């Protein structure tokens, strides 16, 4: 059987290479967990039939769902395997079938097992977006359809504060937002407002349900507020996210780093145009306690990036273009040199995460697509990474997928539940046809159940006739919704019994390990260079090397995918 014929029947195997969408990125299957000649496949005349690939075992001893012959792309590897789901969690990665008659079976299929055909598909962990302004609930539909299954941030709707900052302020708003979370088929966590110089206003927000706290310059990110917020976080094992002081009113970047006192913090907008200390916020990438992320409007740097940012910034931060000081504030944040350096710092693993900044200078449905566009641009401009071979871009792919999966999960203390495809974790999985990888998922699974899929006319005789578009599936309806998605809170919240007090239906899961994670723990993205930014030219130098690149004029994963 030729390799081509085998791949068409059972999907790629060890040594086969797959192009990601229309990029120049190639991944190569490193290992095949299935056994040649013993593969399982569902369909008429196929293997998964009673007495053949399907065993006589009862429900307790078989998988609830098996994704057959899928290529897994995750931070830990690129492998071909069957994936078992049981009770909403990933149960195993291995070889599925009937252990009574087949060798090497690690996943039993029975009458209680549903099958999802993964032949020819790539499976990734559900994306995690940790920079959400909850301005409109419709963002969740867009995010979920793009492959994001967990959203962390703050807000209360299109309030002026939420339009600019990712904070859900105070116990009353926190209770209302947690109640609203019960209505959406996605994992959610809310950040309280961290801008206060005394502990009690912050502690009460964490008790009320906050997953962590957010410091934002628009509320006054002073050294005193930073110190107080991190002290409360240390006491409650929660994470702090920070948008630093663009105007350098409360101090320069050195004063902010000093206020951290070596404590762990997630720095939003560690990048070219999102805000923070101008012009040298990128310096914090070299700090061992700083977990840096950037947002997707500047990803990747293109010929259009600068032009779109000024108006975007004026709207999001409630600025008036007729006021000279407001205009100067906006222009200080948009620097081509630091945006270009951001591309390279992502490629070298100094910037550990990528998120959206939804409707507040960011596009909630484009975290994944812009991650892979950035990876493509860097390959075209900088060539293969030292860790990669001439045959594939496996390391680069692992580095970039980690930016929106495992590293955000580690940062916010939820990696014990989500962020990777590993046994025991919540079964949030995204299935992709390789030609549409990163652009349009084929199916999104939440908590082991199909939540969103590309579906044709519901009145048609088969599932595929036009119009085919994303439609919500049964995991988004009735009681299944609350049993297939999670709400993340602090242990303090859980101890306070807010689930019963608020009348919440979703399972509440406490975050953990938020205060011990460091830059060293950022998988494939742990580089800590010494960075300097010239205050006059904005040139960025990392470990003695000037970081600069040209803007892209053309990108993959773009117009050819969105003609209709």
From Swiss-Prot:
Keyword Membrane: no
Positions bound to Ni(2+) 2: 214, 243, 269
Name of the protein in question: Urease subunit alpha
NCBIfam families: PRK13206.1 (NF009685), PRK13207.1 (NF009686), urease_alph (TIGR01792)
Subunit structure: Heterotrimer of UreA (gamma), UreB (beta) and UreC (alpha) subunits. Three heterotrimers associate to form the active enzyme.
Keyword annotations from UniProtKB, A to Z: Cytoplasm, Hydrolase, Metal-binding, Nickel
Cofactors (names): Ni cation
Catalysed reactions, semicolon-separated: urea + 2 H2O + H(+) = hydrogencarbonate + 2 NH4(+)
Family per record: Belongs to the metallo-dependent hydrolases superfamily. Urease alpha subunit family.
Residues the entry annotates as binding substrate: 216
Active-site residues per Swiss-Prot or TrEMBL entry: 317 (proton donor)
Positions bound to Ni(2+) 1: 131, 133, 214, 357
Gene3D superfamilies: Metal-dependent hydrolases (3.20.20.140), Urease, subunit C, domain 1 (2.30.40.10)
Entry's EC annotation: 3.5.1.5
HAMAP family for this protein: Urease_alpha
Species of origin: Burkholderia thailandensis (strain ATCC 700388 / DSM 13276 / CCUG 48851 / CIP 106301 / E264)
Pathway annotation: Nitrogen metabolism; urea degradation; CO(2) and NH(3) from urea (urease route): step 1/1
UniProt cross-references to InterPro entries, sorted A to Z: Amidohydro-rel, Metal-dep_hydrolase_composite, Metal_Hydrolase, Urease_alpha_N_dom, Urease_alpha_subunit, Urease_AS, Urease_asu, Urease_asu_c
Signal peptide positions on this chain: none
Superkingdom of origin: Bacteria
Location in or out of the cell: Cytoplasm
Reported modifications of this chain: Carboxylation allows a single lysine to coordinate two nickel ions.
